[in-house]
Every structure is written in C-alpha cells, then in structure tokens.
Amino acid sequence: VFDKPLQPDDTQKYRAYYPHGKHFWNVGADYGYQHPRWSFNGETALNNNHAVATLNALSFQATGKLSLLALYRFYSYRYYSLFSEAFSDGGSVQNESGLYVGADWHPVRNLSVATYTDIAYSPWMKYRISGSSHSWDNLLSVVYSKGPFTLTGRYRLRIRQKDNAGKDALANEITQRCRWSAGYTARQWSGKVQADFCHYQFDGQTSSGWMVSGNGGWKPLVWLQLSSWIVYFHTDDYNSRVYTYERGMLYSFSFPAYYGKGVRYALWAKAQVNKHLSLTAKIGTTDYLDRDHISSGLQEIQQSAMTDLEMQLKWNF
C-alpha cells in the first residue's frame, strides 16, 4: 500500500498493463521434488489483477557426462509485481511465455560443451514492438582445459522481432556473436588473449564489428595483486557493439560495451595493507580514433579520449 498512486504514462499502448494505483498484493507458492537423477522445482504467483506468473524447471542427469535442463515460464501480460525477478528474455516478469532447453556435456577428459536454445513469445506489444512478437536465442560454448591452459570458443545467435522503419510490420533483428580466447594461469601470473566478432542485421541494413584484447595478472608479493589489459575495437555502429569483462572494485560488475574505433587500456591493483585494511584502485583510458569529442550536452568531452579512476578502501573489523 502506498500513500500516493503509481500513474504510468499509459498513452503508449505498450504501457497499458504497467503497475498503477496504490494497492498491490501478490501471493505465491514454490514447490519441488528431488530424485537422485532428476529434479523438478517451480514457483507460481497470483497478483491483485488476478493474473498468473509461473516458472518451472526440470533437470535430468542423463549420464555421468551429460546433464539436461528444461525451463518453462508463463508470465501473463496482465501480471505485474513491483519487485519480482525471474528468468526471462525481455527482462521483466510480464508479457512472456517461453521454453528454454539446455545441455552440459563432457564427452572426453578436459573438454566441456554447453549449449541452449530459448524460444519466447510475447502476446502484448512492447517498446518499439507494436504487436505480438517472438524471439529465439541460441548459444554454443566449447571449453578445453589442460593444466594451466584454457581454450574457449563461443557462438551466439539471437533473433528478435521489432517494428520496421515504416512501423507497419515486424522485422527480424538478427545478432550473431562469436568469441575465441586462450588463457594461461600460473601460480603468480596469468594471461589471456581474446577475439570477438559481431554481425547485425535488421530491416535490410547490416553492420559488423570486431575486437581483439589481451589481459595479464601478476602477484609479485603476497599482499599485492596487479592486472592490466588492452582492447582494440572496430565496429560500424552501435548495433554491432562488442563487450568485454573488466575487473573492478569489490561487489561491482563491469562489462562495458564499445563501438566505433578505438583503444581501451587499464591498470588494476589491490594491496592488502594489513589484516584489517585493503586498498583497491583502477585507472583506465578509452581513446577513440574516429571522433574528436565524446558524448553530447552536459556530458560532452571536448577531446577523443576519456579517463576513469576508481578507488576503494575496505576495513575488516
């Protein structure tokens, strides 16, 4: 119960079933069953709009080397919950039904193969989608590890429907991503090189992008850790942007997107000053090669490079 009503702007039809009013309630039940080789669990909820959301998963250990997972969800377009979180393609527990099927296979020693396919349907319109729509997400990942060496290959195909340029029909937005990496981890140091590729297609338009990156870690002393990385990216536009992981502060997650042409380089360090105090710092610079300024408006930077600095002190009592 709120003292003031929620009043979303429902002049846009896709917002017609957003939460509104002052009084909300949700009731739900979770359930499950465990077996030595398979398990079933799920949760079903009902809201004050008398709409249902349910998520159910079935896992099966087919052999000692192969495990399977199936996950079904149904989130009514009339269902809403202010703080709910659950597996979905669209990012919210509303207006979606779908089936996810995945497998984890270890055919031989040191080799693992993971794959999934996920099909989803949304009966109600969404932002930039003026009707019911479908999506299809697929991933194949292969990892080979032997001793300190690791080789990884990954391919992802994602298809979503969106309004075309004329907004008179839906068109398929097709994004393909491929990644290859090789890593080495020793007692005091580690290194990794990675290559990423992206191809984007929508309504007759295409764009592509690629990125190469390398990072290294070193622990010269018991109390000191150092990491550095460098990235070169080259994409046609934002649609073919590329992503890479960056180590950051404790409890933070950094997975920035890069587009255009440029170089990113950064240094990370952590020092355990004593048993109570630790200091973590990171400094990085992104230098664009295809522009003379960055961003616009109040955030505009009148040069082609920008530097970011983070520091964190942690005291353990």
Residue ranges and their predicted role:
Residues 2-11, 16-317:
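Exposed, low-structure sequence patches enriched in small/polar residues
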